[in-house]
Amino acid sequence: VHTHRSFRNPPALPHAAVVETLERALRDRSFEGEVADTLVGTALNDDDHAFVEHWCVEVGTRAEPGSPLLGLAGLCLGHTARRFGRLGDEAVKLAESLASRAEADPADVDGRAMDGFDDVRSFLGLWPSQD
């Protein structure tokens, strides 16, 4: 029997459900597993730019060192930059910081943060000049 695996992007959830899930995981690491679909679905499918950016920044600043939520937040900032074509200064600085931390110590922040920062630089035109 051949099994076909399928991939689907998670849907955006109502804001109240997003806030509840993210706050619970930020208070108690045992709930971190619930966050991936919630944050990715929000970053990919929620049309409220301010809400999406706010929660990517919240997760990226409040998650503990070594938490997989840090790399996820960086990745989702990249999705947000791609979708909306803009990020606030705090979000850009956070994406850069998370990527730097991932490069320095992947046990602190996983490599998804570097992918996210690449997207931020690409979609916001922030690549360093090649003088």
Language-model features: locations:
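Structural signature of alpha-solenoid helical repeat scaffolds
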Residues: 30, 64-65, 105
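A contiguous binding-surface segment within folded domains or other stable secondary-structure elements
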Residues: 34-51
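N-terminal "cap/leader" segments of large eukaryotic alpha-helical scaffolds
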Residues: 1-37, 130-131
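Amphipathic alpha-helical scaffolding segments comprising HEAT/armadillo-like alpha-solenoid repeats
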Residues: 15-23, 47-60, 83-99, 126-130
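Residue-level detector of extended alpha-helical repeat arrays and alpha-solenoid scaffolds
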Residues: 32-36, 70, 110
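Eukaryotic acidic, Ser/Thr-rich intrinsically disordered low-complexity regions
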Residues: 2-3, 92, 97-131
